[in-house]
Amino acid sequence: MIISASTDYRAAAQRKLPPFLFHYIDGGAYAEYTLRRNVEDLSAIALRQRVLKNMSELSLETRLFDETLAMPVALAPVGLTGMYARRGEVQAARAAAAKGVPFTLSTVSVCPIEEVAPAIDRPMWFQLYVLKDRGFMRNALERAKAAGVTTLVFTVDMPVPGARYRDAHSGMSGPYAAPRRILQAMTHPAWAWDVGLLGKPHDLGNISTYRGNPTGLEDYIGWLGANFDPSISWKDLEWIREFWNGPMVIKGILDPEDAKDAVKFGADGIVVSNHGGRQLDGVLSSARALPAIADAVKGELAILADSGIRTGLDVVRMIALGADSVLLGRAFVYALAAAGEAGVRNLLELIEKEMRVAMVLTGAKSIGEISADSLVRELGA
């Protein structure tokens, strides 16, 4: 299959993966309205073309949390990344490091912190949930510190699991899920050999290390689901703010008032996110939520955004709407599933090329020059 655009990787991943894995990363909550709007709302934003601006000197480099990024992009935390390629978190982290952008390891990764951190030559980020088992949280934070993690990304929009109906149809969950997954793996021999057999162990590395015994998909659905904490409040995060002496980012902000609360709390950054449309269906797309949040807190902390970003044009749109940087989730997992580390590297190169074209043709010579003026004000807006 020919890969000529960043969006080509989705079809390539679908061909290679067992359905339960493809639909797990591809799907969203309930009827998936928000999942679709994330992409549609962002792609509908018109860029303002400018010409004859002498764009011979152009830089995508930016600074974020005292790090220099080759472009305003980081790889988002995605659970079970190690099921999409052999030791997938390690491969994705290497690709990100090679392209000069951060990789964020998920709490529910296949590869543990201690396996991923030594594999790259730049500090990585780590994502954590608020769970009822505070012992696990403290253990994960201590291990992240010991591994040299610089930035903590704290996900706050999962006090309860989202209802992902597609998972029951695909075999990730629902009746006879385990035998259905086995049958699907048998019909995808390339994945079964490379990931299913050679990619073992398939347990949740960070959780297994804490519990002292192997964990798997049933634990992902069971133990983790039982440990989400609906009683979470800002007060529950105070001990973490005191414990963690590096940058702390609150992920899952969609309302300006919550963004203001993050400033009061002392967060170093927020991620404007609806969890890729995987939690509450019917909420605002990130693209629609971002401008009001930027108006409320821009300059008081770093603003990152995710959900719906598939191309370099989308990155430029999000920056113009008020983000300082973005997180790529599904996009990099599709590339990882299709072609491993090389696929993620190529995706990031395509994103960079698409950004360069967009910046040249909107007259922005640096990331700092991308602004609301880079967008067309639609009639009636």
Curated annotation (Swiss-Prot):
Keywords: Cell inner membrane, Cell membrane, Flavoprotein, FMN, Membrane, Oxidoreductase. Substrate binds at Y24, Y129, R164, R278. InterPro entries: Aldolase_TIM, Alpha-hydoxy_acid_DH_FMN, FMN-dep_DH, FMN_HAD, FMN_hydac_DH_AS, LldD. It is an enzyme of class 1 (oxidoreductase). Disulfide bonds: none annotated. It catalyses: (S)-lactate + A = pyruvate + AH2. GO terms for molecular function: FMN binding; L-lactate dehydrogenase activity. GO terms for biological process: aerobic respiration; lactate metabolic process. Residues 1-380 form the FMN hydroxy acid dehydrogenase domain. Catalyzes the conversion of L-lactate to pyruvate. Is coupled to the respiratory chain. This is L-lactate dehydrogenase. It comes from Pseudomonas paraeruginosa (strain DSM 24068 / PA7).
